[in-house]
Amino acid sequence: MASRRRMLLKVIILGDSGVGKTSLMNQYVNRKFSNQYKATIGADFLTKEVQFEDRLFTLQIWDTAGQERFQSLGVAFYRGADCCVLVYDVNVMKSFENLNNWREEFLIQATPSDPENFPFVVLGNKIDVDGGNSRVVSEKKAKAWCASKGNIPYFETSAKEGFNVDDAFQCIAKNALNNEPEEEIYLPDTIDVAGGGRQQRSSGCEC
């Protein structure tokens, strides 16, 4: 049987400070939520092993600072990304209005080989706040924006409750995998000398 190699896929999460980027990443990777997160300084990342159709790969998720003073660091962190996630708070109109700025900044600094077809995914977060009564950005408005940018996949999430987080990241992983060029980057795999099977962490998604 052919050996299974683990491929590295890089995902960047962008959005205004306070929209829940760190919370979403930690909910997906660690199944944890905290109200005590401090603003990300520069950038940080977590990894998660995922599997699609008998292929193992490591999803490297970069959580970047939303403050303007850190945006100059973008070039170093954005380049080599396989998918970009744009996050806004459904209760803060300005965070939604800034999505276009984040998208344009990524395309300028990351310089993808095919910018018109580079995969983005949009997450409208914090739908749990005040039972939805504080919401100012409608799902219809968000979907219309996504459609105008080439039908970007859209998910509404609650990092606090874990709602839709797995489905969103499965779609993100699938888009990242589909964008991976021919010259794939592989991580060294371990040899199972005992002949046992490898644990499967996650299943494929439909997106």
UniProtKB/Swiss-Prot annotation:
InterPro entries: P-loop_NTPase, Small_GTP-bd, Small_GTPase. It is found in: Cell membrane. One of its GO terms (molecular function) is GTP binding. GO terms for biological process: protein transport. Signal peptide: none annotated. One of its GO terms (cellular component) is plasma membrane. The modification Cysteine methyl ester is found at residue 207. It is a lipid-anchor. A lipid is attached at residues 205, 207 (S-geranylgeranyl cysteine). GTP binds at residues 15-22, 63-67, 125-128. Its main location: membrane. Coiled coil: none annotated. Keywords: Cell membrane, GTP-binding, Lipoprotein, Membrane, Methylation, Nucleotide-binding, Prenylation, Protein transport, Transport. PANTHER family: RAB FAMILY, RAS-RELATED PROTEIN RABG3C-RELATED. Belongs to the small GTPase superfamily. Rab family. Protein transport. Probably involved in vesicular traffic. NCBIfam families: small_GTP (TIGR00231). This is Ras-related protein Rab7. It comes from Prunus armeniaca (Apricot). The lineage of its organism: Eukaryota, Viridiplantae, Streptophyta, Embryophyta, Tracheophyta.
